[in-house]
């Protein structure tokens, strides 16, 4: 199995380290042709407006959207989630891939200095709580009828799934816990 990491900005190295610990081959996706040789893709955290600009400059936006619409599994964390979302509440004109039927609000959990981590029960990962690291995190404010919610914080979804797409408002790559990456790999092999 070969997993791509969208490598134009953000927490690329951290996701790569997690996948290496799981002994998975990684591809740093920087060009459209890289999308042809992977079994799934991670869209890391970073700055969402910059993401869109760089995706379009590298001619990745339309090709990535088509691959995702045709079933390529994806996991988006923080800004990666924003990129996948259908709608952005506080930036309605910002372009997105529109492959996950949710509405998000950018930076809903505050600025950098207000970042935090907390332990959350995520039933699909087992009994042990998962450390969720929120850094200028988006908030999912609305979900479509086919979106599964795997975890919530303060009654808001923080980990969702729709078809081949996983979306997280937090950063699992900033912990030592491999369970979310393992879950994503399982989804990629189905």
UniProtKB/Swiss-Prot annotation:
> According to the UniProt entry, what is the EC number of this protein?
4.3.3.6, 3.5.1.2
The record's section on Pfam families has:
SNO (PF01174)
Spell out the catalytic residues: 78 (nucleophile), 171 (charge relay system), 173 (charge relay system)
Positions annotated to bind L-glutamine = 46-48, 106, 135-136
Which InterPro entries does this chain map to?
Class_I_gatase-like, PdxT/SNO, PdxT/SNO_CS
Superkingdom: Bacteria
Q: Which UniProt keywords apply?
A: Glutamine amidotransferase, Hydrolase, Lyase, Pyridoxal phosphate
Q: Name one GO biological process term.
A: pyridoxine metabolic process
Q: Write out the GO cellular component annotations.
A: cytosol; glutaminase complex
Q: Name one GO molecular function term.
A: pyridoxal 5'-phosphate synthase (glutamine hydrolysing) activity
What is catalyzed by this enzyme?
aldehydo-D-ribose 5-phosphate + D-glyceraldehyde 3-phosphate + L-glutamine = pyridoxal 5'-phosphate + L-glutamate + phosphate + 3 H2O + H(+); L-glutamine + H2O = L-glutamate + NH4(+)
The cross-references to PROSITE patterns, in alphabetical order and at most eight, read: PDXT_SNO_1, PDXT_SNO_2
UniProt pathway? Cofactor biosynthesis; pyridoxal 5'-phosphate biosynthesis
- Keyword Hydrolase annotated: yes
This chain's function reads: Catalyzes the hydrolysis of glutamine to glutamate and ammonia as part of the biosynthesis of pyridoxal 5'-phosphate. The resulting ammonia molecule is channeled to the active site of PdxS.
Q: Quote the subunit structure annotation.
A: In the presence of PdxS, forms a dodecamer of heterodimers. Only shows activity in the heterodimer.
Q: What family is this protein classified in?
A: Belongs to the glutaminase PdxT/SNO family.
Q: What is this protein called?
A: Pyridoxal 5'-phosphate synthase subunit PdxT
Q: Which organism is it from?
A: Dictyoglomus turgidum (strain DSM 6724 / Z-1310)
Q: What lineage is on file?
A: Bacteria, Pseudomonadati, Dictyoglomota, Dictyoglomia, Dictyoglomales
Gene this chain is encoded by:
pdxT
């Amino acid at each position: 199995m070969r997993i791509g990491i969208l490598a134009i900005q953000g927490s690329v190295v951290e996701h790569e380290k997690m996948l290496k610990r799981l002994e998975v081959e990684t591809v740093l996706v920087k060009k459209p042709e890289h999308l042809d040789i992977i079994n799934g893709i991670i869209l890391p955290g970073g700055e969402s407006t910059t993401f869109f600009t760089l995706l379009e400059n590298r001619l990745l936006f339309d090709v990535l959207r088509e691959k995702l619409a045709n079933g390529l599994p994806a996991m988006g964390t923080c800004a990666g989630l924003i990129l996948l979302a259908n709608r952005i509440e506080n930036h309605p004109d910002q372009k997105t891939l529109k492959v996950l039927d949710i509405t998000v609000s950018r930076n809903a959990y505050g600025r950098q200095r207000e970042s935090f981590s907390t332990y959350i029960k995520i039933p699909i990962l087992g009994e042990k709580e998962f450390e969720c690291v929120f850094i200028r995190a988006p908030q999912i404010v609305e979900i479509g009828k086919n979106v599964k919610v795997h975890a919530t914080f303060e009654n808001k979804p923080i980990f969702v799934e729709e078809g081949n797409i996983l979306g997280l408002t937090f950063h699992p790559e900033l912990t030592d816990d491999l369970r979310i990456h393992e879950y994503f790999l399982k989804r990629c092999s189905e």
